[in-house]
């Protein structure tokens, strides 16, 4: 019973709604339509309200039923009735009615309205339909039913969505628009100006395309018009077009995270690539490195909200650095907020830091434009106040020139790495010049060696501009044709002048004519016969030349006249350059040194040249220009100064013997950071203490040799384990076994670096096994052990070799001894004054074998040995 009353009430309300729109429908057809709705939609509400959303769901079910069962299962008037009821529930757009109202206001061309005409607001939708019983019934005649069918057929043709297809409706609208334009032109010709209004009737939007049958029936909504285009500058339009064409526009940082378009802001996240590069820069170079600060300055030009700055700092900084940045950022924001409060700017402290009611990112998009500049300034200032990072920077020793890499490309990589680490440009250039020579390949080093001290980076690049693979091939062919090594050919190339003639100044040794050493250290110098002077004719005291006689009296004590001729060459005229008591340009002694104060215990020592120390360089020797010997009866202790230790310079202590006549040098290192030592800077001190002689003394003088350990031997007892030794070969470490039976060292192929060049050797390698044409290194390799022994060799490379073998080409340079001494004989010989590798003898005459002792037969007793 209640169901019947609900249906009658629903039919009655539908009739009232349709009559309100001027359409008369019989109740019989409405009852049949409602029955079909209940059949298709069993869930259709029998009680409660029917709104637009529920009615659209009914339309979806009708469309599904139409698709599955075909048009014969759907009554003809169903789609029309559903469309009529949908429009009764939704009055959102009635364009023709608004246009008609606007046209009525413009009927009198001579009448100027006082105010801008406004559109009539759309009528409110009818109230929701309530389901309650009602006994009222309304019946239609046959004439009314026929009129209803005609009106229903015309109704959906007047729908707004079909203006593009209905010629009559389109013509009516065009006539109205054309009439409106004619009236406007007539008013302008009459001299009457219409008031400007941005809400004047806009130009008609483009009509949508032809609709599908479901859209024409009203089951599907018509497709909307395209959204209005965003306003962009000409440069942004060009970048957007280039991006669509596939061009890379990542270098143009013009897209801020906060944008404005048609007075509406929107947000875009930061590019992941930009955050990744900033994270790598903070990890490798530190947060305060010049390269990292430059990236932060570039990031600060964007309109970043506070949450973006905090997320960027949290992602790129360590935990401690992030807390320091955050506290400094809050402090900077507090200062800015105080200034804003005094000047009446509506940007509070909570807005700047993004806390409180402004914690969400959406609320941070509505700040004043100047607030983003203040936030970026505070974030950048807080970033710059972070402490210098103590993390390990990129190892400069790894920036090495490849065998085929152009020298200018290598210098460019080196300068780029140093520029990212060091902010001091002068110190960076000094370090770059030093590494540009040390990390270059062998060919460039040979070309740069004569100009290492007097050239700069520009000279280095110009000298090595033509050195490449073809140059190395030519050097190798020249060495093969001349029967010389590559080093000798390179030296020969350096010794030629611009005209191709051999230079006279650097042609080699003046004694033997061979390159590679000077005449003072020539091994053949001592083999030449030199006339020994007889008794001096001037003083008659000794055997020396008269020109070298310095005696003031003769053998009888009579005074002698001064020696005629030119005396020794003196210092050049001009002002003297003093470096803490040390006269530059002359050979200084201990007597030339000065103390800092009257009560200073040590004599100050300083470096003579500008030097840069890095942690990768290890211990370096610094020249002081001061030579021995020390005062008689004293010995020197070389110690560091407290001021140098505070700067990070580590001075390694040492002992200077009393009879040492060479140059006193300072052993210094910078284990923690890069240190710059200027010329004349006091970094060490020499403490003189009394010499106490105790124990046995070897009868020889140290002279100018032996700076460092001179009598230290590497001793390794032969055990069941293999005698292994680690060598550093061209900055790489290799461990191998000592092999006294191998003429040339051999490196296993699995340990050989792939970037090192090698060639096929025209020889046969024999040992326990045999191999033909083995591979050999194409260039000379420099090796060095932990004791400072160094040399060059060209090892063989063999596959399937389990270990590396160090042969006699390395062991001979190390000075390795193989002997099996008897403890009793060794102790006896040492007591008699035996010196290793020199033998017995008072004058070190080299008697290695024991003397053949023969007793004196002329005397009796204990005996006398000659």
Curated annotation (Swiss-Prot):
In the C-terminal section; belongs to the dUTPase family. It catalyses: dUTP + H2O = dUMP + diphosphate + H(+). A motif (PTAP/PSAP motif) lies at residues 202-205, 287-290. A motif (PPXY motif) lies at residues 208-211. One of its GO terms (biological process) is proteolysis. It comes from Sheep pulmonary adenomatosis virus. PROSITE patterns: ASP_PROT_RETROV, ASP_PROTEASE, G_PATCH, ZF_CCHC. InterPro entries: Aspartic_peptidase_AS, B_retro_matrix, B_retro_matrix_sf, dUTPase-like, dUTPase-like_sf, dUTPase_trimeric, G_patch_dom, Gag_p24_C. One of its GO terms (cellular component) is viral nucleocapsid. GO terms for molecular function: aspartic-type endopeptidase activity; DNA binding; dUTP diphosphatase activity; structural constituent of virion; zinc ion binding. Nucleocapsid protein p14: Nucleocapsid protein. The record marks 99-100, 256-257, 477-478, 713-714, 831-832 as: Cleavage. Residues 734-810 form the Peptidase A2 domain. Gag polyprotein: Late-budding domains (L domains) are short sequence motifs essential for viral particle release. They can occur individually or in close proximity within structural proteins. They interacts with sorting cellular proteins of the multivesicular body (MVB) pathway. Most of these proteins are class E vacuolar protein sorting factors belonging to ESCRT-I, ESCRT-II or ESCRT-III complexes. Gag-p12 contains two L domains: a PTAP/PSAP motif which interacts with the UEV domain of TSG101, and a PPXY motif which binds to the WW domains of the ubiquitin ligase NEDD4. The active site is at 739 (protease). Its EC number is 3.6.1.23, 3.4.23.-. Pfam families: dUTPase, G-patch, Gag_p10, Gag_p24, Gag_p24_C, RVP, zf-CCHC, zf-CCHC_5. Keywords: Aspartyl protease, Capsid protein, DNA-binding, Hydrolase, Lipoprotein, Magnesium, Metal-binding, Multifunctional enzyme, Myristate, Nucleotide metabolism, Protease, Repeat, Viral matrix protein, Viral nucleoprotein, Virion, Zinc, Zinc-finger. Residues 103-148, 550-570 are annotated as: Disordered. Residues 119-128 have a biased composition (Pro residues). This is Gag-Pro polyprotein.
